[in-house]
Amino acid sequence: MSQNKNTICLFDVDDTLTKPRNAITNEMKELLASLRTKIKIGVVGGSNFNKIKEQLGENFINDFDYVFAENGLIAYKDGSLLEIQDIKKYLGEENIKKFINFVLHYVADLDIPIKRGTFVEFRNGMLNISPIGRNCSQQEREEFEKYDLEHKIRSTMVSILKEEFKSFGLQYSIGGQISFDVFPIGWDKTYCLRHLPEDEFKTLYFFGDKTFLGGNDYEIANHPRITQSFTVKSPANTLAILNDFFFKK
């Protein structure tokens, strides 16, 4: 069967294709390969390219028609690089320094059960802020997620940063278990859509877990170009929906 080149299915990574920061399963890889014989497929993750590669595999840029890291600020088509955006050019070094200094002071004064390291991760198109620190263990990551749900550590921090830096033109997006992303307004996951021409792609599907307001899948899930979005809770949920929607006879 020939591939329908006018239809594409876009996938988030954590809690959609994989468990958070875990490797993709063979079952998921096989189903995606089967789906790719029907339509084009793409991945759009908030993480940087190397982190997505750790989860989806060394050869992942050849397993998808499109790969969008950092919301599409790093974009690949058919295994070839299309674009790399740069937050340094947008904000300038002085503003970046002011922002990071404020974040580090805030985290230093934050009273949470544990802290580890890498509270600010500088990426090409965004800053990733983690109150607990990105190099916490998987168990600590899961414990922080529960703590954050109750105590609203991330959402409170986002509110304070929005007020403090309202002139910077920044957008904030809570994703994953332990962090949130900061990037120029419009550089959310909808950014990737500019690489999918409207005259070429007529039907677009999106699968993601953080589709709620403030989540890093919200903007793309609700974008007018998305034909249908699917809110999922786990890779198992994604598998079930894919089988039911695309393969059920």
Curated annotation (Swiss-Prot):
Binding, Mg(2+): D12, D14, D209
Domain of life where this protein originates: Eukaryota
Localization in the cell: Cytoplasm
GO MF terms held by the record: metal ion binding; phosphomannomutase activity
UniProt source species: Dictyostelium discoideum
Protein's recorded name: Phosphomannomutase 2
Gene: pmmB
GO cellular component terms, semicolon-separated: cytosol
Keyword check for Metal-binding: yes
Keyword vocabulary terms for this entry: Cytoplasm, Isomerase, Magnesium, Metal-binding
NCBIfam families: HAD-SF-IIB
Enzyme class (EC, first level): isomerase
Disulfide bonds: none
Binding of alpha-D-mannose 1-phosphate, residues: R21, R123, R134, R141, S179, D181
Similarity remark: Belongs to the eukaryotic PMM family.
Protein EC: 5.4.2.8
InterPro entries linked to this entry: HAD-like_sf, HAD-SF_hydro_IIB, HAD_sf, PMM, PMM_cap
Gene Ontology biological-process entries: GDP-mannose biosynthetic process; mannose metabolic process; protein N-linked glycosylation
Task performed by this protein: Involved in the synthesis of the GDP-mannose and dolichol-phosphate-mannose required for a number of critical mannosyl transfer reactions.
Catalytic activity reported: alpha-D-mannose 1-phosphate = D-mannose 6-phosphate
Catalytic-site annotation from UniProt: D12, D14
Subunit structure: Homodimer.
Biological pathway: Nucleotide-sugar biosynthesis; GDP-alpha-D-mannose biosynthesis; alpha-D-mannose 1-phosphate from D-fructose 6-phosphate: step 2/2
